[in-house]
């Protein structure tokens, strides 16, 4: 090859430096270039058109006029191929000069191209990149690390501004070419530059080359549209995949550069310094991302020191972040060993090193990263942790008050962290499911008026209006109904609700969240049809394979639910069905029950399948439990093979015993317990017994979510203390039968269009078809003892709106916290809330509630009148 056969020709721009440019006539068919590059630069005659677009100041992408330099795209190929050609020609001094020339040429373009990127990044500054980050690599960028080179490539095509003159498009093809050069047979490389290329690296290179349309595709169609970028940038997921591809190519190119130009270390040209500019300052990958295919690359990780293990000459550190754990290895002879050895657990560090495969016997199949480890070369301590009050690693139990006081540490623990991520994904699913059904999301006010909805309000004093208070909403009830009156057909929101009530296992004190929704022109069946697929879907999606009741869910009337299950929120996993056995005890020889029945009591039978063979101590234990729960005891009959046994059986005629056995669907080998009281307390106690026996005998169906609707709630009930009629549940429900029922029926016989959705004995939601007519609303409240003036005072806004045309409407509000609690299989709702209060409604982390300075109270015109402490009575 003659020395004059150069592929470069000058291209000058006013005010710009001379830059080499590929002569397509030289490239096409030249033996120094592979067919793919010849096709790329000269195929289909598109090269000139591309150069014209690059040089057009008014082009759509805003590119400034400049030349296309080959960079490493051709530099790597030229060096390898020309070394081979010169050696074969044996041209002596001419060959040496030729080699020197092409060496300098190739080295210049590798250095210039990569340092150009680094300089571009430094000139623009990180803040400008970060400003465009979401539009460049997607919102979930940590899952696909935003390597600076990938971010740069994305930014230049997606952000049209005037600083693009610092970027050279040949960098893209340079990265591809550096890797592609490694696929040349070792015999054609100087000093065997490609003899240790792994199959994984070849696969990455081939995949990447095809992604970018370089290999085997000639000039792809995307160039014919005069855009320089591949279709991989059309969606966030494709951009993320491209980011990973580019990062992989850079890593491989870096590891092979010294072999492509032997004797000319890359550090001499600032290549490694430029490459360090490509890696993010804190991480190139997450701690849950590296796999066996990444072996050989350089990686940077940041996270918390999860565990440390000192094996003498090696220190193993499990580094943890939000995404997972990666094992890092530090040799005792390493200069960074001392710094890392002193880092306590939960210190935050950044490590840089080489990814290597673990040996077969050290692979950890429990970790997604268990096939690799990081050989640490550099360590930066970001922050040192104090001695921990609670350990993050491990599964040690701690008192709840300590966990809540150090909740930020507790949230790092694997199970708690997973619960919060589950909560986030569930909320996202619910939101998308509702939008998919045509619902529109709105945000209703947080500061509103106080209204009597069954619990105490949290009150907020008004500084501007002395003596007056706002209230935090117990639910968006009135606002969502007003939205229907305002003409919005389907509303929903993930609504915060605030109630000043005591906490319990399935209820967080203070605040909770619900999937609140409302619909116009609907019946009860329409509401069910709207929410059932959402609930069925979310439990199937996140239920870890557990069975879910298929829609439509079964419906149980309130009366049947109280009779058969002893609760208006039945747990259908429990097969026990309660039976009414009042009549067999009426006038019987068992005087205790007979007398109570004569006074209006009822008797409920709670079967205990297969319990006849239990020892006497088991029955005595249940009897003691009943007394602890306020009952006089728990009578029972054992249906043994040799006949009924127990104190009650001895005082009943055989016919009555058989009637009980038939009514409760009992068989030999079963036992039965009894509850005798007025209807409501008897039903509630029987429900407690049903739950207790189901758990004692391990009868509950496993790995299943059992849904049902409880319907036909009574509109009114009698207050046992006052003897007055009051609303039993939601006062805004439409009475079944409308005005006619209110005028002509006994209030205690009127049912409402009201319903609850229940799963595994947990009430997820109450809902109703609303009372949208002012005349019916006035009458309904009148029966419950409220005057028209009272209704107008407390519900005037909604009532006034109804006077101007209100559509029939209804809705519900499944509790988000309870949904997540069930999916996470947690017994306590505080386990799925980020920063919960304790049972006493205290936030131990933020020390709330807290005393307020007197001057702030004066601004609010509030004087605190604390209860006087009780005086101790001294004995003697």
Curated annotation (Swiss-Prot):
Top-level EC class as recorded in UniProt: ligase
Q: Which UniProt keywords apply?
A: Aminoacyl-tRNA synthetase, ATP-binding, Cytoplasm, Ligase, Nucleotide-binding, Protein biosynthesis
Q: Which CDD domains match?
A: AspRS_core, EcAspRS_like_N
Q: Give me the reactions it catalyses.
A: tRNA(Asx) + L-aspartate + ATP = L-aspartyl-tRNA(Asx) + AMP + diphosphate
Q: EC number(s) for this protein?
A: 6.1.1.23
Ranges for the region named Unknown are 1-278
Molecular function as annotated in GO: aspartate-tRNA ligase activity; aspartate-tRNA(Asn) ligase activity; ATP binding; nucleic acid binding
Span list, region Aspartyl-tRNA synthetase: 279-876
Residue positions annotated to bind ATP are 499-501, 763, 815-818
Major site of localization recorded for this protein:
cytoplasm
- Tell me, which GO biological process terms does this entry list? aspartyl-tRNA aminoacylation
Q: Where in the cell is it found?
A: Cytoplasm
Q: Where is this site: Important for tRNA non-discrimination?
A: 311
Residues annotated to bind L-aspartate: 453, 499, 729, 770
Q: Which GO terms describe its cellular component?
A: cytoplasm
Region labeled Aspartate — which residues?
477-480
Q: What does this protein do?
A: Aspartyl-tRNA synthetase with relaxed tRNA specificity since it is able to aspartylate not only its cognate tRNA(Asp) but also tRNA(Asn). Reaction proceeds in two steps: L-aspartate is first activated by ATP to form Asp-AMP and then transferred to the acceptor end of tRNA(Asp/Asn).
State whether it acts alone or in a complex, and with which partners, per the record.
Homodimer.
NCBIfam families, per the entry: aspS_bact, PRK00476.1
Family in the record: Belongs to the class-II aminoacyl-tRNA synthetase family. Type 1 subfamily.
Protein name per Swiss-Prot or TrEMBL:
Aspartate--tRNA(Asp/Asn) ligase
Q: Which organism is it from?
A: Paramagnetospirillum magneticum (strain ATCC 700264 / AMB-1)
């Amino acid at each position: 090859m003659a020395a004059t056969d150069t592929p470069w020709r000058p291209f000058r721009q006013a005010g710009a430096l001379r830059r080499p440019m590929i002569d397509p006539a030289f490239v096409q068919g030249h033996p120094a270039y592979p067919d793919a590059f010849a096709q790329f630069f000269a195929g289909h005659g598109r090269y000139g058109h591309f150069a014209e677009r690059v040089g057009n100041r008014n082009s759509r992408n805003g590119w400034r006029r400049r030349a296309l330099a080959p960079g490493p795209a051709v530099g790597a190929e030229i060096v390898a191929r020309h070394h081979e050609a010169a050696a074969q020609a044996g041209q002596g001094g001419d060959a040496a000069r030729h080699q020197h020339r092409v060496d300098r040429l190739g080295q210049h373009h590798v250095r210039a191209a990569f340092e150009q990127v680094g300089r571009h990044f430094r000139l623009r500054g990180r803040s400008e990149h970060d400003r465009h980050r979401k539009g460049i690599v997607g919102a979930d960028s940590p899952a696909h690390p935003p390597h600076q080179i990938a971010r740069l490539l994305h930014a230049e095509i997606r952000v049209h501004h005037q600083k693009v003159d610092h970027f050279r498009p040949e960098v893209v093809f340079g990265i591809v070419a550096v890797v592609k050069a490694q696929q040349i047979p070792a015999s054609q490389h100087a000093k065997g530059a490609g003899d240790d290329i792994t199959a994984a690296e070849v696969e990455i290179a081939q995949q990447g080359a095809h992604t970018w349309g370089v290999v085997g595709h000639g000039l792809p169609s995307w160039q014919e549209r005069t855009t320089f970028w591949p279709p991989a940038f059309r969606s966030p997921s494709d951009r993320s995949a491209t980011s990973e591809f580019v990062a992989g190519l850079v890593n491989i190119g870096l590891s092979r550069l010294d072999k492509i130009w032997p004797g000319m270390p890359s550090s001499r040209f600032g290549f490694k310094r430029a490459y360090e500019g490509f890696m993010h300052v804190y991480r190139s990958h997450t701690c849950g991302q590296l796999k066996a295919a990444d072996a050989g690359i350089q990686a940077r990780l940041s996270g918390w020191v999860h565990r440390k293990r000192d094996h003498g000459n090696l220190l193993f550190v499990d580094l943890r972040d939000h995404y997972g754990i990666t094992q890092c290895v530090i040799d005792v002879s390493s200069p960074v060993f001392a710094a890392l050895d002193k880092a306590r657990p939960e210190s935050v560090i950044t490590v840089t090193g080489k990814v290597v495969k673990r040996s077969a016997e050290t692979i950890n199949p429990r970790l997604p990263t268990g096939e690799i480890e990081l050989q640490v070369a550099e360590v930066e301590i970001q922050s040192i942790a104090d001695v921990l009050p609670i350990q993050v690693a491990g599964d040690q139990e701690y008192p709840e008050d300590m966990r809540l006081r150090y909740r930020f540490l507790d949230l790092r623990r694997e199970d708690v962290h997973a619960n919060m991520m589950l909560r986030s994904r569930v909320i996202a699913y619910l939101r998308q499911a509702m939008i998919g059904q045509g619902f529109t999301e709105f945000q209703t006010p947080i500061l509103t008026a106080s209204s009597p909805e069954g619990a105490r309000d949290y009150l907020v004093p008004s500084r501007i209006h002395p003596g007056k208070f706002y209230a935090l909403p117990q639910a968006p009830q009135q606002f969502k109904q007003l939205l229907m009156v305002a003409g919005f057909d389907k509303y929903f929101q993930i609504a915060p609700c605030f109630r000043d009530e005591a906490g319990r296992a399935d209820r967080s004190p203070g605040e909770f969240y619900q999937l609140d929704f409302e619909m116009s022109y609907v019946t009860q069946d329409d509401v069910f049809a709207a929410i059932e697929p959402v609930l069925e879907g979310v439990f199937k999606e996140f239920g870890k394979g557990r069975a879910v009741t298929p829609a439509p869910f079964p419906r149980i009337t309130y009366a049947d639910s109280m009779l058969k299950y002893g609760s208006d929120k039945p747990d259908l996993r429990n097969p026990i069905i309660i039976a009414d056995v009042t009549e067999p005890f009426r006038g019987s020889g068992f005087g205790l029950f007979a007398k109570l029945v004569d006074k209006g009591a009822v008797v409920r039978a709670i079967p205990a399948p297969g319990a006849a063979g239990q020892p006497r101590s088991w029955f005595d234990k249940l009897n003691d439990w009943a007394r602890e729960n306020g009952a006089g005891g728990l009578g029972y009959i054992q249906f043994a093979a040799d006949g009924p046994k127990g104190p009650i059986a001895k005082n009943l005629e055989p016919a009555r015993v058989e009637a009980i056995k038939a009514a409760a669907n009992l068989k030999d080998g079963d036992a039965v317990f009894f509850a005798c009281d007025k209807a409501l307390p008897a039903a509630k106690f029987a429900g407690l017994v049903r739950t207790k026996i189901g758990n004692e005998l391990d009868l509950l169906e496993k790995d299943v979510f059992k849904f049902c609707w409880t319907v036909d709630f009574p509109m009114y009930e009698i207050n046992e203390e006052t003897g007055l009629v009051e609303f039993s549940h939601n006062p805004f429900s439409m009475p079944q039968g409308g005005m006619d029922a209110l005028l002509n029926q006994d209030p205690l016989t009127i049912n409402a269009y009201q319903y609850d959705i229940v799963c595994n004995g947990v009430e997820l939601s109450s809902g109703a078809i609303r009372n949208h007519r002012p005349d019916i609303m006035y009458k309904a409240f009148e029966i419950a003892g409220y005057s028209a003036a009272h209704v107008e005072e407390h519900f005037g806004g909604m009532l006034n709106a109804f006077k101007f045309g209100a559509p029939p409407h209804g809705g519900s509000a499944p509790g988000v916290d309870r949904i997540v609690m069930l999916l996470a299989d947690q017994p306590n709702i505080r386990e799925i809330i980020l920063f919960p209060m304790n049972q006493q409604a205290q936030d131990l982390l933020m020390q709330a509630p807290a005393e307020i300075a007197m001057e702030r109270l004066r601004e609010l015109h509030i004087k605190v009148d604390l209860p006087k402490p009780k005086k101790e009575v001294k004995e003697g």
